[in-house]
From Swiss-Prot:
Positions that bind Mg(2+) 2: D226, E227
Pathway: Amino-acid biosynthesis; L-tryptophan biosynthesis; L-tryptophan from chorismate: step 2/5
Record family assignment: Belongs to the anthranilate phosphoribosyltransferase family.
GO cellular component, one term: cytosol
Residues reported to bind anthranilate 2: R168
Binding locations of Mg(2+) 1: S94, E227
Name of this chain's protein: Anthranilate phosphoribosyltransferase
Organism: Phenylobacterium zucineum (strain HLK1)
Amino acid sequence: MSDAFKPLLSRLADGATLSDDDADAFFSACLRGEPTPAQVGAALTAMRMRGETLGEIAACARAMRRAAIHLEPPFPTIDVCGTGGDGLHTLNISTAVGFVAAGGGLKVAKHGNRAMSSKSGTADVLGELGVNIAAPPEKQLQALDEAGICFLFAPAHHSAMRHVSPIRAELGFRTIFNLLGPLTNPAGAQRQVVGVFAERWVKPLAQALGMLGSEKAWVVHGAGLDELTTTGETSVAEFSDGKVRLFTITPEAVGLRRAALADITGGSPAENAQALRRLLAGETGAYRDIVALNAAAAFLVADKVETLREGVELAGRVLDEGRAQAALERLVEITAP
């Protein structure tokens, strides 16, 4: 069976790009464990050295979506997540944003994993907060409905990745799969705020989300962070109405102070969980500001507000009124084993 992939690998080695059909077929085969580890590693390496194309990214995402264990909520959802890999070890921003967005009335299907290159991934800090990250689908749906947020643990929903995960770990460098977490939400979130680890991926991932059927999405990179940032300027690609629009955002433009990276640097999962608890309890400062900015983007993408500044103000009210904290508490209650 593995001999069937040799012609494709030869083309990749010569620098060719894969057609949509070839890419879809190859990645689907990878998720079934058909190519040998050496063949998967060779393909990933060739694509990384040449530069992954938009078609290859979309095809790989489609293959992952088909192989996923899906959650099917009866209402529209939004996801707020990043690719990770920025290497800056910040506090958990998108995790906190999920609770603020839920407290503001959105239904947040938060897709995430344990830390890969950071010290504290979404799953790590949620575990410290008392959330059962292994909650069954019926509990996830209940949490979405009643708490406004659920957590979709990537390994549980993308079990087919077990065929490629050891290969990725052995390679030790970024591959196309590092871009795919935000493109493969198991609940089929049609609206998203996606952070990417490098600015060059802002526009391509927005285009990919459009190809994959998103209604509206922001793909962002902020001064080295896979988030909107208060430490500098954020580059944004908005997909909406079938088009991609590029623009930049500064914190001052929405009434926020510029911060230093040191002000939002995190630590262990336990330390980041404590910081998140203090934030939800009303603590002000740089962490609150960057969370409010990212939550504002979620509110805007979900058409909850008309401007980013209005979104920042709504995020502040949600935090001050304890609604984000209530979302966390209800999520913990519902997912308890």
